[in-house]
Amino acid sequence: MAKSKFERTKPHVNIGTIGHVDHGKTSLTAAITKYFGEFKAYDQIDAAPEERARGITISTAHVEYETEKRHYAHVDCPGHADYVKNMITGAAQMDGAILVVSAADGPMPQTREHILLARQVGVPAIVVFLNKVDQVDDAELLELVELEIRELLSKYDFPGDDIPIVKGSALAALEDKDKSIGEDAVRLLMSEVDNYIPTPERPVDQPFLLPIEDVFSISGRGTVVTGRVERGVIKVGEEIEIIGIRPTSKTTVTGVEMFRKLLDQGQAGDNIGALLRGVDREGIERGQVLAKPGSVTPHTRFKAEAYILTKDEGGRHTPFFTNYRPQFYFRTTDVTGIVTLPEGIEMVMPGDNVAMDVSLIVPIAMEEKLRFAIREGGRTVGAGIVSKIIE
């Protein structure tokens, strides 16, 4: 099935397979590429290369394929720990996920944990592939497993009653056996993914935000901040807010330059210098953000989901307890924060993932799903994501 080069005119969506070990995530990934992309065999996907994201090494396999409607980038991880790290660090962003559950086993501990993680890190939508249906002869048993999956999804605030569940066999698809549960099921799955997982809003259509990396003054012109526009568009003459660390203030962008050329606007992905009206060099600093007024607010207290590195990954050698005070690295700067562990959790060991409350000593421009690194003296010891803002 030779395919021509990918058309970039289609909307692009990032997805991934999640679910319990040996339920068939990698086989399904291979089967999807067989019908919608350049076929990648199970072994090619399973031998995932290691990558580093936020100082953490993660094994992830990336494949790409396309349906009539969309172009997809798909990630599959070989080990459970890789999933946890991947979802928390956002190394591979997911606009949606395909949850793979073996019909023979039903939901297992990692099924539950991946659904919880998907909820915590804000994966917007899930479609289910009920795999290995050829191993279950009893239709009632299949119904029970489906019911169990729906209940589990609902428990973690996904719309369990509405989520599409496609029954099939990834192996049958790979081996060209029983077409109804093989090829047909994989095609049906992708049509459900096309229709059920929303197309993400492009960064350029979102409200403007630029994390400040550097500040300097140009004599006779004023104060310039530099950084990469994270989202949205900024036009010369627009009013913006300076948010985080200090009280929020307003200013007007009087100039935008890129590669020493003056522009009338900067947009998501551009590295720009922005000239600000009436801002003193001392009144602004790295770690603050420029943003569209009212679009983002400063906060100090939040709930987070975090992964703590093992000693081998260069992390801590010892556990930590409530009142642990590391630095939290948000976007471009470190801020000290105080950790409170949930009731019933005495300590956190290197290699754990944990839900925790954090209180920062100064406010940071913050939204749910914002990611951060946890550092001690400049060394990364963990990674996390804001799951809920408290104040």
From Swiss-Prot:
It catalyses: GTP + H2O = GDP + phosphate + H(+). Its EC number is 3.6.5.3. GO terms for molecular function: GTP binding; GTPase activity; guanosine tetraphosphate binding; translation elongation factor activity. Keywords: Cytoplasm, Elongation factor, GTP-binding, Hydrolase, Magnesium, Metal-binding, Nucleotide-binding, Protein biosynthesis. It is found in: Cytoplasm. Residues 131-134 are annotated as: G4. Residues 76-79 are annotated as: G3. It is an enzyme of class 3 (hydrolase). InterPro entries: EF-Tu_GTP-bd, EF-Tu_GTPase, EFTu-like_2, EFTU_2, G_TR_CS, P-loop_NTPase, Small_GTP-bd, T_Tr_GTP-bd_dom. Residues 55-59 are annotated as: G2. GTP binds at residues 19-26, 76-80, 131-134. Belongs to the TRAFAC class translation factor GTPase superfamily. Classic translation factor GTPase family. EF-Tu/EF-1A subfamily. PANTHER family: ELONGATION FACTOR TU, MITOCHONDRIAL, ELONGATION FACTOR TU-RELATED. This is Elongation factor Tu 1. It comes from Bartonella quintana (strain Toulouse) (Rochalimaea quintana). The lineage of its organism: Bacteria, Pseudomonadati, Pseudomonadota, Alphaproteobacteria, Hyphomicrobiales.
